C-alpha cells in the first residue's frame, strides 16, 4: 500500500523535474516502482499484474513503453521511461526491465524503446535499488 510519506516523496521528485502535473501523472505516481536514472529520466516498473494492467490502461504521453521482441516470449513487469530520456538511460532502463522478468541472465535479448533497439543482457535487480525514488 502506498503510504502518504512515500507518495509525498514521489510528488517532490516529480515536481523537481516537471512542473506540469496532470491527472494522469498523479494516477501514475500511485502505480509501480519509480526510479530516477543517471541522466535524470524517470522510469516506472509495474510491481504486479494489477499495476501492469493499470499502467497499460491509462496511457501517459510523457512516457515510452519498454518492449520485448515478441518472439522472445518474455513475461514480466511492464516498464516505461521518459520520452526525453538519453540513450544511456534508455539502455539502463532496458536492462532493468529485463531484470524484472524470468529471462535468463546469461542470454541477450532485443528490447525496444520507441524507435531504438538494444541487444542486451538483463541487469542485476540489486542495481535498481540505487535508482529508486525514496
List each language-model region with its residue ranges.
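Nucleotide-activated chemistry modules centered on ATP-dependent adenylation/adenylyltransferase
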Residues: 1-87, 96-105
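Generic C-terminus detector
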Residues: 84-134
Amino acid at each position: 500500500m502506498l503510504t502518504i510519506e512515500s507518495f509525498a516523496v514521489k510528488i517532490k521528485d516529480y515536481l523537481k523535474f516537471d512542473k506540469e502535473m496532470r491527472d494522469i501523472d498523479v494516477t501514475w505516481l500511485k502505480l509501480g516502482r519509480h526510479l530516477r536514472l543517471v541522466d535524470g529520466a524517470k522510469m516506472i516498473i509495474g510491481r504486479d499484474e494489477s499495476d501492469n494492467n493499470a499502467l497499460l490502461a491509462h496511457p501517459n504521453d510523457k512516457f515510452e513503453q519498454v518492449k520485448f521482441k515478441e518472439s522472445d516470449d518474455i513475461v514480466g513487469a511492464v516498464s516505461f521511461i521518459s520520452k526525453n530520456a538519453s540513450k544511456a538511460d534508455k539502455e539502463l532502463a532496458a536492462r532493468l526491465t529485463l531484470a524484472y522478468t524470468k529471462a535468463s541472465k546469461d542470454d541477450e535479448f532485443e528490447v525496444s524503446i520507441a524507435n531504438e533497439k538494444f541487444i542486451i543482457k538483463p541487469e542485476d535487480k540489486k542495481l535498481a535499488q540505487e535508482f529508486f525514488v525514496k
